[in-house]
């Protein structure tokens, strides 16, 4: 007689074992119709799964993140179903969930075209409208192998053979189509109402370039058609803001196959990058950080001690010389501990805040590289704070304040916070993880911050707080992190110590923190957020002074020199072109201010000022212009309430 406890604390007793769906039906027909699955004692279960003993149950609908995830996964199966009907010879590989949607990797002779995508999507919609039931069968290993061998699904066979310890597999029956998955999935295809296939890309089987190149069909899926419509509208806007296109048209940077995943910064892009870096450098000064620099390449033994070699070696670039193995650093923390360890610190010296604009390299798969957003070489605005356990809360709170102030200065005021706990693959003892997680979560609560819990998503060495900013078209970007680390400073790792008040050696707590994350990625976010129309303080070129005729050139150059002495980034346009042409060209380059000099301006010692939006601000003397620009720049990117 299982007793089911619901999230509101209410209990329901049943005579016999009961399915998740039967519990939903017992509560109400409306809830049963909306129920996709359930969390039974924290574990996701099918709506058809039996509950045989007392349990806590959360019913999952499309209003829940879990529900969206399940629906999107089922949409991948629906894609597989449609593909096999249209292309019976296609071989199905894997079809997981990704952000906002799903994909399926397939091996087939035909090259899928945009027109083919429309036909595949049409077939998916036809199948979904039938609301056919999805049936799961736990199938013995031998039978599962036989099923996929008979269907000539070579990739499914390989997956089964690579899991020798599994005795049975979940096979999902979609009418005549069978797929393999851990699940759960929707009870019937009526839950899939709003989706769209977006594009096709190439992908190596299992991400290994030695394997066959497959076709990967991507799609997005949402709970209802309005959400899908809003998302597609956002994507249209994002296409116009693509930092790769703007990077080219604004002459900021380029990427090249000569160096996959690594940016070539042009003068204007380098200026923008430097402005961002120098802003962060000033924050270091104001918040009592000490800036350091550590080697790019360090001995393998350091990475073995730190735990990176065991957990991260597949993503590390390595080299060898004089019979010694080295790794190009993927992270800065081990190097920072070497700097900390160079001197023996007292508890009176703590906290010690070490910061670095550290260039790191990670061997990301070529298929995942994307402009500045996903790269192999990037600079982290990285810092590590060595402190006592008693100082954790104050230091974490200071980091949180720095995050929010920094994002506000760059024009972001919608920040989401997530708290990630211990992953399965980790270093350190559970009692140490308990301390670390409790310390971070308590600081969040004391700061009255709303946050989402992400179980199992922490770093291998400690739990973390993640900060995600929402841009002007509603996209969410994960940037800042604060991570608590009780492990890497321990004797069996990198053995950082300080002398405590008891005159004994103790291991400090290490707080990893990054505000922007990757500078390259953050610049890419800024380009898309502002569509290249940067606030004046960020703009690579803040002003252009255009002469109307050659006779005005000397005056223009002198005016520009004076502006440069006041720290402004200014260019002179002395070309023998019509002034209207010059204005249009610099407007397309998103320059905040265009100054025009003709006979009247030269005679009066002024310039005519046009703002980026096209507004003619009139004539300004040099002093008036300096006052106006200084006020503009002082606002940084902060959003001014009207």
Swiss-Prot record:
Identify the Gene3D superfamilies for this entry.
3.10.20.30, 3.30.54.20, Anticodon-binding domain, Bira Bifunctional Protein, Domain 2, Threonyl-trna Synthetase, Chain A, domain 2
Q: Name one Pfam family in it.
A: HGTP_anticodon
What sort of enzyme, by top EC class, is this? ligase
Residues that coordinate or bind Zn(2+): 333, 384, 512
Give a GO biological-process term. threonyl-tRNA aminoacylation
Required cofactor names = Zn(2+)
What reaction does this catalyse?
tRNA(Thr) + L-threonine + ATP = L-threonyl-tRNA(Thr) + AMP + diphosphate + H(+)
Query: What keywords sit in the KW lines?
Result: Aminoacyl-tRNA synthetase, ATP-binding, Cytoplasm, Ligase, Metal-binding, Nucleotide-binding, Protein biosynthesis, RNA-binding, tRNA-binding, Zinc
Please give the superkingdom of this protein's source.
Bacteria
Tell me the compartments it is located in: Cytoplasm
Query: What's its EC?
Result: 6.1.1.3
Q: Which GO terms describe its molecular function?
A: ATP binding; metal ion binding; threonine-tRNA ligase activity; tRNA binding
Report the InterPro entries cross-referenced here.
Answer: aa-tRNA-synt_IIb, aa-tRNA-synth_II, aa-tRNA-synth_II/BPL/LPL, Anticodon-bd, Anticodon-bd_dom_sf, Beta-grasp_dom_sf, TGS, TGS-like
User: What SUPFAM superfamilies is this protein classified in?
Assistant: Class II aaRS ABD-related, Class II aaRS and biotin synthetases, TGS-like, ThrRS/AlaRS common domain
Which stretches make up the TGS domain?
A: 1-61
Spell out the residue ranges making up region: Catalytic.
242-535
Q: What is its main location?
A: cytoplasm
Give yes or no: UniProt keyword Ligase.
yes
The UniProt entry's GO CC annotations, sorted and at most eight, read:
cytosol
SMART domains the UniProt entry points to: tRNA_SAD
Query: What is this protein for, i.e. what is its function?
Result: Catalyzes the attachment of threonine to tRNA(Thr) in a two-step reaction: L-threonine is first activated by ATP to form Thr-AMP and then transferred to the acceptor end of tRNA(Thr). Also edits incorrectly charged L-seryl-tRNA(Thr).
Q: Which PANTHER family match?
A: THREONINE--TRNA LIGASE, CHLOROPLASTIC_MITOCHONDRIAL 2, THREONINE-TRNA LIGASE
Task: State the name under which the record lists this protein.
Answer: Threonine--tRNA ligase
Name the species this protein comes from. Hydrogenovibrio crunogenus (strain DSM 25203 / XCL-2) (Thiomicrospira crunogena)
Species lineage: Bacteria, Pseudomonadati, Pseudomonadota, Gammaproteobacteria, Thiotrichales
């Amino acid at each position: 007689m299982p007793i089911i406890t619901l999230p509101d604390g209410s209990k329901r007793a049943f005579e016999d074992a009961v399915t998740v769906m039967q519990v939903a039906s017992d509560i109400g027909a409306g809830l049963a119709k909306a129920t996709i699955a359930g969390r039974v004692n924290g574990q996701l279960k099918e709506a058809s799964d039996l509950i045989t003993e007392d349990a806590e149950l959360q019913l999952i609908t499309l209003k829940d993140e879990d529900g969206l995830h399940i629906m999107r996964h089922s949409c991948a199966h629906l894609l597989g179903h449609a593909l096999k009907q249209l292309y019976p010879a296609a071989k199905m590989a894997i079809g997981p969930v990704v952000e906002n949607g799903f994909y399926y990797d397939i091996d087939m002779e035909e090259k899928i075209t945009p027109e083919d995508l429309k036909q595949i999507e049409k077939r998916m919609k036809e199948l979904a409208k039938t609301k056919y039931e999805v049936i799961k069968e736990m199938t013995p290993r031998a039978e599962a192998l036989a099923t996929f061998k008979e269907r000539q699904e070579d990739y499914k066979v390989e997956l089964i053979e690579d899991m020798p310890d599994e005795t049975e597999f979940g096979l999902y029956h979609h009418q005549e189509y069978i797929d393999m998955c851990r699940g759960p999935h929707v009870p019937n295809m009526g839950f899939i109402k709003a989706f769209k296939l977006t594009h096709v890309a190439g992908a190596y089987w299992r991400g290994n370039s030695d394997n066959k190149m497959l076709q990967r069909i991507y799609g997005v899926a949402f709970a209802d058609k309005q959400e899908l419509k809003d998302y597609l509208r956002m994507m249209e806007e994002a296409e116009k803001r693509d930092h790769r296109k703007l990077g080219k048209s604004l002459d900021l940077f380029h990427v090249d196959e000569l160096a996959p995943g690594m940016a070539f910064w042009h003068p204007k892009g380098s200026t923008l990058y430097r402005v961002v870096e120098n802003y962060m450098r000033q924050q270091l000064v104001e918040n009592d950080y000490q800036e350091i620099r550590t080697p790019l390449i360090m001995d393998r033994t350091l990475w073995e001690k730190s735990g990176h070699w065991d957990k991260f070696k597949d993503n590390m670039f390595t080299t060898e010389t004089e019979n010694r193995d080295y790794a190009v650093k993927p992270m800065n923390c081990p190097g920072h501990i070497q700097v900390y360890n160079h001197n023996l610190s007292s508890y009176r010296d703590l906290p010690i805040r070490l910061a670095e604009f550290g260039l790191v390299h990670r061997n990301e798969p070529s298929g995942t590289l994307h402009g500045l957003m996903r790269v192999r070489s990037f600079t982290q605005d990285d810092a590590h704070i060595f402190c006592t356990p008693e100082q954790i809360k104050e230091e974490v709170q200071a980091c949180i304040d720095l995050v929010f102030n920094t994002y506000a200065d760059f024009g972001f005021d919608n920040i989401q916070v997530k708290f990630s706990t211990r992953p399965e693959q980790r270093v350190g003892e559970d009692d140490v993880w308990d301390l670390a997680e409790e310390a971070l979560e308590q600081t969040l609560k004391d700061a009255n911050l709303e946050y989402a819990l992400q179980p199992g998503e922490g770093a291998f060495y400690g739990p973390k707080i993640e900060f995600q900013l929402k841009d002007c078209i509603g996209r969410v970007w994960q940037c800042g992190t604060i991570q608590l680390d009780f492990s890497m400073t321990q004797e069996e790792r990198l053995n950082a110590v300080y002398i405590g008040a008891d005159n004994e050696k103790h291991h400090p707590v290490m707080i990893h923190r990054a505000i922007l994350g990757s500078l390259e990625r953050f610049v890419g976010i800024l380009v898309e957020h502002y569509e290249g129309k940067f606030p004046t303080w960020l703009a690579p070129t803040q002003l252009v002074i255009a002469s109307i005729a050659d006779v005005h050139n000397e005056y223009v150059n002198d005016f520009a020199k004076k502006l440069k002495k006041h720290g402004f980034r200014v260019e002179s346009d002395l070309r023998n072109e019509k002034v209207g042409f010059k204005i249009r060209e610099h407007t397309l380059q998103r320059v905040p201010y265009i100054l025009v000099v003709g006979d009247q301006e030269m005679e009066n010692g002024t310039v005519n000022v046009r703002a980026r939006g096209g507004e003619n601000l009139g004539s300004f003397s040099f002093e008036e212009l300096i006052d106006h620009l200084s006020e503009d720049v002082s606002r940084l990117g902060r959003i001014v309430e009207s």
